[in-house]
């Protein structure tokens, strides 16, 4: 009798172990970048209390830029230079930004200054910049400077006719595009809707890059959303996408009686349209 029980247990363990190792769930990547960091202590503190996979984009001219860079570095958080760039509108940008008509030397000097402030940045994205990112000459000068410093470029896509990605490729600079703006609108329901859209985009395409800002409703949506992130979505820093790193496999499920897995989570997200409007 004991022999039969031991044999059954042994076979059951072998069976369940085989299923344990033969099945895994695919995951999609979600990268979230918070722009305009360095201005507001309270809101910045809330962002820095979030998982370190949330990347921060620091404006070099912001009063707390150096301090936020140091804090992000100490947390192991990915950092971007949030570079002010000329928009199509007449809105004035911060000091140290990039304007149409600048020479290569001027652009290089501005990038050097920004990197000396945001010292641990691994990349750059544009603050405004609807005119700048559509200008081939300015983008050529910028990508040349970024290539020398081994920085990647995240195009915030504030204008549809941006040439930043095209020029980056020509200059040997890794370039990525923003897919979702979380807070074109500051209304809680709208930000929540955009967060769901980012989840949907990641599932459909394998990865998604969402950009938001340190604002109360954005913070509230992220605090709730990140606590309940579906198991098929992996939150990653921007460096993960820049380096094309593989997702970390989720914990496998032990399938005891069926090879057909139960769902990992109840689907809380639906395909939704994106909000219209030009950000910033």
Curated annotation (Swiss-Prot):
Q: Which UniProt keywords apply?
A: Signal
According to its UniProt record, what is one Pfam family this protein matches?
Answer: Polysacc_deac_2
Question: Biological process GO terms, please?
Answer: carbohydrate metabolic process
* Xref: Gene3D superfamilies: Glycoside hydrolase/deacetylase
Family matches, as InterPro entries: Divergent_DAC, Glyco_hydro/deAcase_b/a-brl
- Respond yes or no to whether keyword Signal is given for this record: yes
Protein family (similarity comment): To E.coli YibQ.
Name it: Uncharacterized protein HI_0755
Its source organism is: Haemophilus influenzae (strain ATCC 51907 / DSM 11121 / KW20 / Rd)
């Amino acid at each position: 009798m004991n022999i039969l029980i031991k044999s059954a247990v042994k076979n059951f363990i072998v069976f369940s172990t085989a299923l344990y190792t033969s099945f895994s769930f695919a995951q999609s990547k979600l990268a979230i970048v918070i722009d305009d960091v360095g201005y507001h202590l309270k809101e910045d503190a809330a962002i820095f209390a979030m998982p370190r996979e949330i990347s921060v984009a620091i404006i070099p001219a912001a009063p707390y830029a150096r301090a936020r860079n140091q804090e992000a570095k100490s947390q192991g958080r990915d950092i971007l230079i949030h570079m002010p760039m000329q928009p199509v509108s007449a809105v004035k940008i911060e000091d140290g930004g990039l304007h149409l008509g600048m020479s290569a030397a001027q652009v290089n000097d501005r990038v050097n200054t920004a990197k000396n402030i945001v010292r641990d940045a691994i990349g750059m994205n544009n603050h405004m910049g609807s005119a700048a990112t559509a200008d081939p000459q300015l983008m050529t000068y910028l990508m040349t400077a970024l290539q020398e410093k081994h920085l990647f470029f995240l195009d915030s896509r504030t204008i549809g006719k941006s040439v930043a990605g095209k020029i980056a490729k020509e200059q040997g600079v890794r370039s990525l595009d923003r897919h979702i703006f979380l807070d074109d609108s500051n209304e809680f329901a709208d930000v929540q809707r955009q967060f769901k859209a980012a989840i949907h985009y990641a599932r459909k395409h394998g990865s998604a890059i969402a950009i938001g800002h340190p604002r109360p409703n954005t913070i509230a949506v992220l605090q709730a959303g990140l606590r309940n992130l579906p198991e098929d979505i992996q939150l990653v820093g921007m460096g993960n996408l820049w380096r094309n790193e593989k997702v970390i496999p989720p914990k496998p499920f032990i399938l005891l009686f069926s090879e057909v897995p139960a769902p990992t989570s109840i689907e809380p997200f639906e395909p939704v349209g994106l909000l219209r409007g030009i950000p910033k």
